[in-house]
């Protein structure tokens, strides 16, 4: 008696598994379930996804055609080289005064620095 009941249970479980697999497949099984894509729908889908798939060359070209972003405030007055050097030396002197150490300025102004 145990043999036929185990066989019946196995058959029922197999039938349930197969029916679940058949119903869960993503592809339409019958002709009535197929989508009928009209040309207008296809154009809509192409337009909705078309910008997502730009080639690398067109992206590079678009980036190259754009002007570079402005990185500084255009209203700033630029310092001349002597003004920048004076500002740099003043900040060095201030840092030396804050440290209180003896600093030999001749090391900064050696002749070999100016012979390039």
Curated annotation (Swiss-Prot):
The record marks 35-36, 52-53, 72-73 as: Cleavage. Residues 1-26 form the signal peptide. The keyword Membrane does not apply. Keywords: Amidation, Cleavage on pair of basic residues, Cytoplasmic vesicle, Hormone, Secreted, Signal. Residues 53-75 have a biased composition (Basic and acidic residues). Induction: Down-regulated in omental and subcutaneous fat of obese animals. It is found in: Secreted; Secreted, Extracellular space; Cytoplasmic vesicle, Secretory vesicle. It comes from the Eukaryota. The modification Glutamine amide is found at residue 49. Coiled coil: none annotated. GO terms for molecular function: neuropeptide hormone activity; type 2 galanin receptor binding; type 3 galanin receptor binding. Its main location: secreted. GO terms for cellular component: dense core granule; extracellular space; transport vesicle. Residues 27-35, 50-116, 74-116 form a propeptide. Transmembrane segments: none annotated. The keyword Isomerase does not apply. Residues 52-77 are annotated as: Disordered. One of its GO terms (biological process) is negative regulation of renal sodium excretion. Pfam families: Spexin. Plays a role as a central modulator of cardiovascular and renal function and nociception. Also plays a role in energy metabolism and storage. Inhibits adrenocortical cell proliferation with minor stimulation on corticosteroid release. Belongs to the spexin family. This is Spexin. The lineage of its organism: Eukaryota, Metazoa, Chordata, Craniata, Vertebrata.
């Amino acid at each position: 008696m145990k043999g036929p009941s185990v066989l019946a249970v196995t058959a029922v479980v197999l039938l349930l598994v197969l029916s679940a697999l058949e119903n869960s497949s993503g592809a339409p099984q019958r002709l009535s379930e197929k989508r009928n894509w009209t040309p207008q729908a296809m154009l809509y889908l192409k337009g909705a996804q078309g910008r997502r798939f730009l080639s690398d060359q067109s992206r590079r070209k678009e980036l190259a055609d754009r002007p570079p972003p402005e990185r500084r405030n255009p209203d700033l007055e630029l310092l001349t080289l002597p003004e920048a050097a004076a500002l740099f030396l003043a900040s060095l002197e201030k840092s030396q005064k804050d440290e209180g150490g003896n600093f030999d300025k001749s090391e900064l102004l050696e002749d070999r620095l100016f012979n390039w």
